[in-house]
Amino acid sequence: VLDQAVRTIQSYGFIIAPGMIFGFDSDTDTVFEETLDFFVDVGLIGGDPSFLMALSGTPLYRRMEQTGRLIKREEEVTVRKKIETNIRYIQDAEFLKKGFVDFIHRYTEPGFQFTRFKKHMDLIMESDTFIPIDHVGYGSPLEYLKIQIKDVQNRKMFMLHIAYLIRKPSTISAVL
């Protein structure tokens, strides 16, 4: 159901950038792999991975406090790191650390990013509901190009995207 909902939203040209939260009690030992597979299957090109954090005043915070699973700090953390939490997880800490690091390596690998981008573009091209934008939007294409060209890895990824668009000229109309 979720995969079809994501495809439907993206078929109109929207880019979904979900929060990927790991560390739920219901997470299985395949959660990292399943999340990566889901991203490819539905062509998600962005997202924000992190660990579950119990925010003060929420039911989760109270539940973790009542069950002795809340890690209290002297000061409340306002800016957090991706791998920081205040919850004692049920899953093994080493499993979560290793799984998250492996996930990030694969998630940010240029080939994996390109695979997701290609799937996203293919879904848009197959769609009869795509609505192209008729303006530039908030970003400056020239500034974007400068950023891409300065960084070696970004430049390589950018060139892969351009090569894909050149090989499939019909895709260009979907991008523009």
Residues of each region from the PLM?
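Long, low-complexity C-terminal extensions of enzymes
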Residues: 154-176
